[in-house]
Amino acid sequence: AALAGCNSDSDNDDAVVEPPAAVTPDSINLSFLGRYSAGIFAESAAEIPAFDPVNKRIFIVNAQKGAVDVLDATDAANPTLIDTLTAADVAADAVVNSIAYKGGYLAVAIEASPKTDNGFVALYDATTLELLGSAQVGAQPDMLTFSPDGQYLLTANEGEPNNDYSVDPVGSISILSLTDDEIVEVRTATFSSFNARRDELIQAGVRIFGPNASVEQDLEPEYIAISEDSTTA
């Protein structure tokens, strides 16, 4: 950002000149720089990345392992594996679904075993890789993101049913309040208020088709976007 000022004899000293609106480019150009190979083909061994610009590290969800691979990208042309974070310290037989990085912290979304049980979010120090804390959220947290101001961490809890639909958890969004390096509060928003409008929603084109499923059971959130002022998601 740049600021400029000058003296003025005008009576309209309070006038504000709006900066030009940012223009989103129609395309971007990408140039190959380097590659890390997990050595596993077609098994989702490199699924979701997050970059730590301070330590020059790349965190990657390795869905084949159900863990997070940590790469040293100091030499960007030749990133190397230096560590792997598992969910074992949080829950037995749990697997990692997603990650997010912000301000020196790595957040990890963890799916419980079975996946229909409530999952977890874990917070790590991105430098030491120390587990700072964890909290229980809704079933099958499938994506998570920090708010722009860093005060909140939100997870989209997909809540998929098991194979025979004998257990069908509700979809939900969990909102974790953060203070420094601690998770201090967890609130979970469900879609239960829409259950009474099931027929209305179906007529409007909303797909609700699970066997005997309520609206909140059939809605399976996968992604979250947050406003720049961190007030709306």
Where are the regions that the model predicts?
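Residue-level detector of Asp-centered blade-edge/turn motifs that repeat once per structural unit
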Residues: F51-N55, Y101-G104, F146-G150, S227-S230
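Beta-propeller blade signature
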Residues: G119-L129, D168-D180
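Surface-exposed loop and turn segments in beta-propeller and other repeat-based domains
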Residues: N29-F41, D83-A92, T179-L219
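Short, conserved, GDST-rich strand-edge loop motifs in beta-rich repeat architectures
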Residues: A109-D117, A156-S172
